[in-house]
Structure formats: C-alpha cells, structure tokens
Amino acid sequence: YLENTMATHAFPAHRQAVLSLLSSQAAISLQNARLYERVQHMAESFSRFVPREFLRTLGRSQFLDIRLGENIQKEMTVMFADIRNFTTLVERMDPKHNVDFLNSYLSYMEPEILAAGGFVDSYLGDGIMALFDSAPASGGTTALACGATAALGMLRALRAFNANHSARAGLQLQIGVGLNRGLVTLGTIGGADRLKCGVIGDTVNVASRLEGLTKRYGVPVLLTGSTQRALTPELRSRTRFLDRVRVAGHVEPIEVFELFDAETKARALDAWNEALELYYARHFAEAGRAFHALDNSFDGDVALRSFEARARKLARQPPAEDWCGIETMLEK
C-alpha cells in the first residue's frame, strides 16, 4: 500500500488506531532498551570503582542498593603491596609518563591477584590493597593460600615487567608485599554526600605494617605467623621465620615470616632454623657463628646480617632474664 500512491483508504480508522498503538509500544520498547543499556554501562563503570565482590560480600547485587553504615565482619587475607622508593624512581619522568608507567605496572599486578581468587579493594597511589576470601573454595580446597599464591605470581610478573618496560626507562622496580589473615569489617564509610566502600580492622593495620617492614628486612614478601600456618605444606616450605616483633600501634607481638621463591633459601632453611634455635635459647656466641656460616646461602641477606650482629652484641652484653627476643618497631 505504501508504495502505491494511487491506492486509497490503505489505512482506515481502525488500522490507524492499531498502527498508533504499535508505534507507541515500539517507541517505549526502544526507550527501555536504551535505558537498560545505559544502566548496564553505568553498572560496568561503577564496578571499576567498587568491586562486584565487595557488593556480593555485603549481600547486594546493585550499587544503588548500598546504604551508609552497612557492614559485615568476615575472615579474609589482606594484602598491601607497594613499589619501593617510587617517588625517587619517577623524579626523572614527566607527569604523563608517570601515570602511563604506573598504569602499565598495575596491569601486570592486578591479573595475578584476580587469578588467585582475590580482588583489588583500592589503589593507593603506587600501592595496592587487595582482599582474599578465607572461606573454603569450590571442590573443598582451601582458599587461605590465595594471598600467598598471588604474591608469588606478582614477583614473577614484576620480573617480566622489568624485562619489558623498566629496562627501557632505566629503572628496575622492587616491591614490598605484606599479608595478614584475620577478621575484618567490610562496609560503607563516609557522610551523606560521599560514600566509600572500605575495609577496616586490626588485621588491615598489621598487613600495612608488614608491607613497611619489607624494607627493614630487605625481602619482597612478609606474612604473619597465623597466615603462614594456614598455607598449604608446599607454600609453607617456601617460608622463612624472620623475627618476633611488636609493630607500631599493635600491643601483641607477632611472628614475621618471609615468603620466597629462591631455591638457595629453600635448601638452607634447616641450617637457618638451627641458628635461630641457638639464638632464642640464649646461646648467642654459637648463634653468631651459625648465622655467619650461612653467608653463601643467603648472600647479601639483610635479616641474616641483623641476626648475626644482634647475636654477637648479646654475647658481649647478655640480656636480662626476662628477655624473649621481641623487637619493638616504633615507626609505622
């Protein structure tokens, strides 16, 4: 009918009414489709700022459902990761190069966290805060080792990043990673006009302190004793006891372990532990000699030099009877 200009009465009144109704419904459908597409786009955009895993933990499926003050307590592994001396490293770069360089680095780190079952809670400048659920994973396997698995993956990714990017920029990045497992509070924090989904608690604070201690001990990854004991036997064989410390802002002392991927350290672990036993048994002179004998296995190791120096000093100046070998850290 429409193509035949000679045709008349192609659309009588009843057909015009039907056509008008169908047109209105089609217009509404198109409008709803565009609205749905926009909502989906907004949801995808928001998910880049607030992880979907965070929403699921709070029992919410949409960002619009979040309300101020919602919170839940949950056992998780908290990770803090930071580039060592980043400010000094990027002084030679212009601002745009700084941002591009940092985004490139983060693009290497984030996949390792996601692959291990974690999610990035926030980016803190050149730092990363990530969370790993400590609940049993599917198939009955433990999820407690996910943070450690991610940390080792990040070390491998860092080597690839340095080979592909840092060499061209004249930089070789090093990172520090702190891991701690325990109870945390996840919730919405802020005021009436500004909300932030975040995680708080002593577990978070200790993980942050451990990341800072990686500089003191000269190792890339540190974890607490409770975190170390929750690892699989294979991963525990990749840990080394380093110290008993009382970190700033924390009353109770914690055990500090290194997580490593070097075969030379793995082969020398028994000798390291024997030297530690001598040290904590107050046989300081013998401990000093035992630590010194490990120089070849732990070449340039900061913790080894520290324990050797401490053992020799205590051999000359024996401590009080209540000495228990706890180091107190005054700085964060």
Whereabouts are the PLM-identified features?
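Regulatory cytosolic signal-relay segments
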Residues: 21-22, 26-73
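Catalytic NTP-binding/metal-coordinating core of nucleotidyl cyclase/transferase enzymes
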Residues: 67-149, 197
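Alpha-helical scaffold within the catalytic cores of cyclic-nucleotide enzymes
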Residues: 103-118, 134-177, 202-215, 236-237
